[in-house]
UniProtKB/Swiss-Prot annotation:
Compartment annotation: Cytoplasm
HAMAP family: EF_Tu_B
Protein name listed in UniProt: Elongation factor Tu
Entry's EC annotation: 3.6.5.3
Species of origin: Terrimonas ferruginea (Flavobacterium ferrugineum)
Residue ranges of the region described as G3: 81-84
Biological role: GTP hydrolase that promotes the GTP-dependent binding of aminoacyl-tRNA to the A-site of ribosomes during protein biosynthesis.
Length: 395
């Protein structure tokens, strides 16, 4: 009887295919699963299974996304592929499918097209750290010089958006050829996965980041003090550690955690993913409210003015029926609370239509603990009309 092989938990990375319509994103996804399935590292998924992605709702926004998973020798990947361009825009802006890296698919026969460029820009805006390029359909291009020109153009486009265009790996291949089992092209898919393994960085584990917990509720326990409850988003907290309570006021409150509670049990520490109650020394119940965050001192600051990349829900998604203009004043929902803010559209933008994505500037009436990449919803009277994330902090 053979011994069970020792399974080491491989590190997990979220990845996705991006690029222009019909450049071969879905065929490539199918080819990756097909080739890795022969090594026992994936379940093969056919083109139609990926392309017929079911609709999902993320914060009221309808997105078609296909999820496949596979492994390489070193890592476990969750891979997203979206059938339509609008699905990508929504996915990236809402962070419905968090991407630690991306495979940019460019057809060698076309070169970078408008959506190629838009996806690169969006990836930069939403903080995708690195991408690997798959130059697809090279079997349809006889001219070596043309391939070189396309490669130069892709590298320039990446550099323009803040990626390291000069050092980004570009793999030349044919997804269709690989799917048909042609050895030459199968090898290029293997090269692609090697490049993804080595060039896309491992994401930091949430527990290793500075402590942050969003306050959902506050109550006082007679004789013990004030308890704030919420979900620990990142980091860990131990009894006796100092914290700051940030947001909805100009300057943070300082306190010390004197107890960590989960499911009515007292613990020594809480960590990312836990729903916990923190007992806070020297803080009155009236000083804390939902929407504040409890953090490692100095790790995050409150701000009112920021730029954001936003997707505005279409009428069919339950969004607005009419466009909005400069000085629009909705509520911005961050983590656990709504704050009113005034919108300033970019110069040259008259209005924003339902179904659009745009970059805009917001001035909140109260400060929120904020950092680049923070997600928010735009609401009117409790109804979600948009979603976005902070791309730059202004004040």
């Amino acid at each position: 009887m053979a011994k069970e092989t020792f399974k080491r938990e491989k590190p997990h990375v979220n990845i996705g295919t991006i690029g222009h319509v019909d450049h071969g994103k879905t065929t490539l996804t199918a080819a990756i699963t097909d080739i890795l399935s022969k090594k026992g590292l994936a379940q093969a998924k056919k083109y139609d299974e990926i392309d017929g992605a079911p609709e999902e709702k993320e914060r009221g926004i309808t997105i078609n996304t296909a999820h496949v998973e596979y492994e390489t020798a070193n890592r476990h990947y969750a891979h997203v592929d979206c059938p339509g361009h609008a699905d990508y825009v929504k996915n990236m802006i809402t962070g419905a499918a968090q991407m630690d890296g991306a495979i940019l698919v460019v057809a060698a026969s076309d070169g970078p097209m408008p959506q190629t460029k838009e996806h690169i820009l969006l990836a930069a805006q939403v903080g995708v750290p690195k991408m690997v390029v798959f130059l697809n359909k090279v079997d349809l291009v006889d001219d070596e010089e043309l391939l070189e020109l396309v490669e130069i153009e892709v590298r320039e486009e990446l550099t323009k958006r803040g990626f390291d265009g000069d050092n980004t790996p570009i793999i030349k291949g044919s997804a269709t050829g690989a799917l048909a089992g042609e050895e030459k092209w199968v090898k290029e898919i293997e090269n692609l996965m090697d490049a993804v393994d080595s060039y896309i960085p491992l994401p930091p584990r949430p527990v290793d980041l500075p402590f942050l917990m969003s306050v959902e509720d506050v109550f006082s326990i007679t004789g013990r003090g004030t308890v704030a409850t919420g979900r620990i988003e990142r980091g860990r907290i131990k009894v006796g550690e100092p914290v700051e309570i940030v947001g909805l006021q100009e300057s943070p409150l300082n306190s010390t955690v004197t107890g960590v509670e989960m499911f009515r049990k007292l613990l020594d520490e809480g960590e990312a993913g836990d729903n916990a109650g923190l007992l806070l020394r020297g803080v009155e119940k009236t000083q804390i409210r939902r929407g504040m965050v409890i953090v490692k001192p100095g790790s995050i600051t409150p701000h009112t003015d920021f730029k954001g990349e936003v997707y505005v829900l279409s009428k069919d998604e339950g969004g607005r029926h009419t466009p909005f203009f400069n000085k629009y004043r909705p509520q911005f929902y961050f983590r656990t609370t709504d704050v009113t803010g005034e919108v300033e559209l970019n110069a040259g933008t008259e209005m924003v239509m339902p179904g659009d994505n745009t970059n805009l500037t917001v001035k909140l009436i109260q400060p929120i603990a904020m950092e680049k990449g923070l997600k928010f919803a735009i609401r009117e009277g409790g109804r979600t009309v948009g979603a976005g994330q902070v791309t730059e902090i202004l004040k």
